[in-house]
């Protein structure tokens, strides 16, 4: 390869990445997921478009694995362990039982539609059996979903790859060796994948945490060290026949939930690297496919995709979540719909090609077609389905920027910046009138380009920018303090007519609103009653019905319900005798 060829590759790569970024701005306007647009750019530049011929499957496998490792590391860093209280076991059930059921149901129909053997059909089911972390993390961000749904989908997508990889590799070996039956030893291999992946992921994350916090480096080197460490954990786990995907996700989880030096620098760079990984991966996968090869299989492939989306995924979700009573029908329906397929199935479809199996090209084309349908149908309709199934909650207003104040190696102090618009309720109020959360301080106030020295008598005006020092756990309270009037109206419509304290006694609430206790303990706190009615760990937005009234969890403090909203039937007035 001469210098001219290398330069041409650089130019083509830069143009494709740049075009993907520029065209992605159409995503919000057209309502199409960014990943579909990037995939389309790759396809248009490929053999049936721009004429770029790319059929190097080992290179695609390399790029895909590298990209997924970075994406999962970033996803783990941003996942809060607190979300495990509501989603860990349901997500693991989906990642194991759910994947197996989806594989079986999809495989049976694939074998029938394409006249394949049962083992070949199951291989197709295994290839497309897992949801994709890149697609889930990308499309769920900023949608305002309740914590139970978001955490379940994110943990599932980060942990279901071991099952899909295990089933795919096992079925490929069976086809290559002519086996037709399953053996109990396969269960041991599966447990090894999860066990080694879990141990090395948690252990590697702990070692990386100690290293980052004990060594003095230039600020820009910490993110690179974390990425290098994550890739080392990923590759070492794969070398020991564990799940590298699970390991790198858990490594990020450990790093993201402990005090770590240069946290914001690490997160900021990982965000950019994760985007670059997604762009590069989907461009390569778009280049890899030959669009005209998809046309002959379009109708049966569409039928298989719809079967998986409308039948196989919902049945697997219902079965996997059957033991977990806290999930409402609406939440199960939404989780069923967000079985997003992305890069993982396409990468797994490369395995049969590299193994030289018969019909391997058909498997690859089918996987690509199903991913395309999943992203277009499920990804595009995600916001609409979230509203239809009522799994969203009003988001807390966020600061326009936040940055770390590294006064200590493990300091968690941050600087939050809020801009006061005309609709802010605190306009015209003096600073002393603001009930700031305990432990927070207003550090500066900007008016136009002028820096003011804030005092208790300083009156806030439209356009003022407040710089507040606090911790991450202060954000909900600060968000309420600097909330907008329209947002408060939305909160009232969502949470109900009144908001009560969670520690209010049930007897007092019943007397106030004229409700019958029906043998319930009058001393029981309202929060405890709601928790019992939910049937599991509650989250903001959970709703229960009692005597025709709707009770909604409004705020949480860890596992504790702080406030509960109550909505009365239309046309009624709350008060004694209402339900007597």
Swiss-Prot record:
Alphabetized UniProt keyword annotations: Antiport, Cell inner membrane, Cell membrane, Ion transport, Membrane, Potassium, Potassium transport, Transmembrane, Transmembrane helix, Transport
Cross-referenced InterPro entries: Cation/H_exchanger_TM, FAD-bd_PCMH-like_sf, FAD-bd_PCMH_sub2, Na+/solute_symporter_sf, NhaP2, RCK_C, RCK_C_sf, Transptr-assoc_dom
Domain of life: Bacteria
GO molecular function: flavin adenine dinucleotide binding; potassium:proton antiporter activity
Cell membrane keyword on record: yes
TM ranges: 6-26, 34-54, 57-77, 86-106, 108-128, 162-182, 193-213, 217-237, 240-260, 269-289, 292-312, 334-354, 362-382
PROSITE patterns: RCK_C (PS51202)
GO CC annotations, alphabetized: plasma membrane
Cited function: K(+)/H(+) antiporter that extrudes potassium in exchange for external protons and maintains the internal concentration of potassium under toxic levels.
Sequence similarity: Belongs to the monovalent cation:proton antiporter 1 (CPA1) transporter (TC 2.A.36) family. NhaP2 subfamily.
Protein's UniProt name: K(+)/H(+) antiporter NhaP2
Species for this entry: Pseudomonas putida (strain W619)
Name of the gene: nhaP2
